[in-house]
Design a protein with these regions (language model features):
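Conserved alpha/beta catalytic core and glycan-binding cleft of carbohydrate-active enzymes
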Residues: 135, 150-151, 156-236
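Substrate-binding/active-site clefts of carbohydrate-active enzymes
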Residues: 2-135, 140-166
Length: 236
């Protein structure tokens, strides 16, 4: 689960509840202070060092597809104030982008627009920070399809993918995609670049059905168990 600084949604706060999941980010570079005793950066570095000493890699769950600012009715906390029209994607109106309607392919009120150079640079800088300064070993990207949308559509040759591959720091770390979002044609399992690993929900569903005793699952179970060649032919 994410460790970058996050906020509770206004609706939860109205109900007296707290978001402990972390999928509502507000600062891409900052460790969540509530997870530490006071010196969050120092404590995070110490944690990573000790995990490495124990022979464990550190893979961060990161959320760069949206922020806690939500849609047009949400608060102005960060990116909206800097450049709302640049950092976020918007629905298309009769005469171009409708800046009163944030695109919402994430289901969280807004969608960060990595088709814009400022957004792309922000995310790349944040990733490099976690690798070079915090010494993590890789990332699991929440709703990764959103990061590769250009003009609203998923592009396996997007600027985001190209930049990740060309970056001397990021090209050597582990990259894991959640290969979907809720936007049009948002399910993209098996369509990420070969340098990426993908969360395989077909494996999850098939194994569950097999152990549940559903009929006719033996062949599909075997396919999933040996690597889902039908979904990931580029890796064979």
């Amino acid at each position: 689960m994410p460790v970058a600084a996050f906020m509770s949604e206004p609706r939860l706060e109205q109900l007296g509840l707290t978001n402990y999941w972390g999928y509502n980010p507000i600062a891409f570079f900052a460790p969540e202070p509530r997870y530490g005793a006071g010196e969050a950066v120092t404590e995070f570095k110490t944690m990573v060092r000790e995990l490495h000493r124990a022979g464990l890699e550190v893979i961060l769950d990161v959320v760069y597809n949206h922020t806690a600012e939500s849609g047009a009715d949400g608060p102005m906390l960060s990116l909206k104030g800097f450049d709302n029209a640049g950092y976020y994607a918007f629905e298309t109106g009769a005469h171009g982008p409708d800046y009163h309607r944030h695109a919402n392919v994430t289901g969280c009120g807004n969608s960060v627009n990595l088709d814009h150079p400022n957004s792309l640079r922000l995310v790349l800088d944040a990733l490099r920070y976690w690798v070079t300064e915090m010494q993590v070993d890789g990332f699991r990207f929440d709703l990764a399809v959103t990061l590769a949308r250009e003009a609203g559509e998923f592009d396996p040759m997007s600027a985001f993918f190209k930049a990740m591959l060309a970056d001397p720091v990021l090209a050597r770390v582990r990259l894991i995609a959640e290969p979907w979002d809720i936007g049009p044609f948002g399910y993209r399992l098996g369509q990420f670049p070969s340098q990426w690993l993908e969360i395989n929900d077909r494996y999850r569903d098939t194994v569950r059905a097999f152990w549940r005793g559903d009929a006719g699952k033996m062949g599909d179970f075997a396919t999933r168990l040996v690597g889902s060649r039908d979904l990931f032919p580029k890796n064979w």
